Amino acid sequence: MRNAPKVFLLVTIILLNCSKTNVVKLPITTTSPSALELYNKAMLSFDVGDGLEKRAALDSALALDPNFAMALEMYESPDPRLRIEHQERAKKMADKITEAERKMLKIRESYRNGDMDMALENARWLVDNHNDSFESYLWLGVVQSDRNELDNAITSLKQAIERNEDCYECNQILMGHHIAAGSQVMLPEDRRDVDLGMQYGDELIRIRNDHGAPFHLKANCYRQLGEFEKAKPLYEKSIEKRKGLSSEGTAYVVSGHNYMFGGDLTTARERYASAIKLVDDNPNSWFILNLYLTYSYIFDNDYIGAIDNISSVEIQLDERNFDEITLLLRKGQASWHKMICYAHNQMEDEAYSALGQRIKFNKKRAELLKDANVTREVKSDEQFQTAWVNILFGKYEDAKKNLEKLKKIQKQRNDPTAMYGYHGLAGMAHLMEGNHELALENFNNGNETAIYFNYFKGLALKAAGNDEDAKKIFNEIAKTNFSSWNIAIVRRLAKKQLGQA
């Protein structure tokens, strides 16, 4: 056994001079202490959205230890086949790593399987068995947040901060419950506290003053309040501190959002163009940042302009060096974006044609990947999207058939949020048929922070004679200053309901 490689098992304990608090991380197994340093560096990049830098550090770590399980799991290659290969290699190392690492791998696998009950069970194990580690409570808080169990999530994340006041991700998630940030799960409108969000933003700046991400998040607070001038210098600081990093384009995009909602659409689109140019050699980032340029046309009620931009992106996809699987994904997404625009612009034939293209590309992608999770998601998506388009064009009986199939698929998932989409669409269908009682019942069983469906919930409340609550919902939507396809569609409609458009 003399020639067997020495395995370094790290349980990091850092003594903080200011507070004398022992900060304990979860154990990570690797044959190389240098690989571990690179892994920790990668996770710092992960925290602030620098994906290329994260993968570069993990490449170096894996060169030193090719069987570094957590590095393989966290690599997250943009190539789906390589990503699956890394995940399978990490699983094969299960008998060489600690039980805590096995639980972390199982949490992430549970997300992929749509089994949020299993994710919760494994996160609770970490807390029960590594109660001294802030990371145990962070994992639990993330899972609880994604399950929309926000009170429990807040408690867990605060317990993580008690164990490590410099936990960047803890403060970021807590802030995101109050201030919009990407796909972060938020508290209901009446429980959001912008001042508290500001405090978390200040903590993020204290913890990572070296990077532009916390300045961007603090600026979001002012944007949420409609104080666009106060947000500008913070967005500029974010751009300055992200120069040369893979997230620099993101800094320009969010600055563009601030100009758009502040009424300067010309400067906003200039910022979007700058962002897109910065990532021209990164096909996935190029595709994603182009979406915000598309959304700017929808916000301006220019669906034809949005469709033109989508078409401009679409014709370039084959030349952008995507891998085979991701190319099909992006073609399906481009078709979906067209479908949304056509459907909400009452262009029926074009909407159904775009829907058909999305379904075709998704099925081909699933066939090539031969991954059970992707196959399930594609089947679910086909029923959801078809039901949605059928509802928008008044084909309610057809939509109900799609919804029954969707319900059957989603009920198989162990996830308290699995039926949110079903209830949102069912609520729309009942509303359009004039049954506001069943509509409200479904909306109330869905995601109470889903802005698109909340617009229709407002219409249902109005139909039921509850003008006060309807107006409250329309006001919440009308003052939302963040960019996504769903907000872009219903924000102007909500203003119209309030007599502001």
Report residues per predicted region.
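Canonical tetratricopeptide repeat
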Residues: 74, 139, 173-174, 217, ...
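Alpha-helical segment of the N-proximal tetratricopeptide repeat
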Residues: 31-60, 64, 102-125, 129-132, ...
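Residue-level recognition of tetratricopeptide repeat
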Residues: 34, 68, 99, 133, ...
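TPR alpha-solenoid repeat register
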Residues: 71, 136, 170, 214, ...
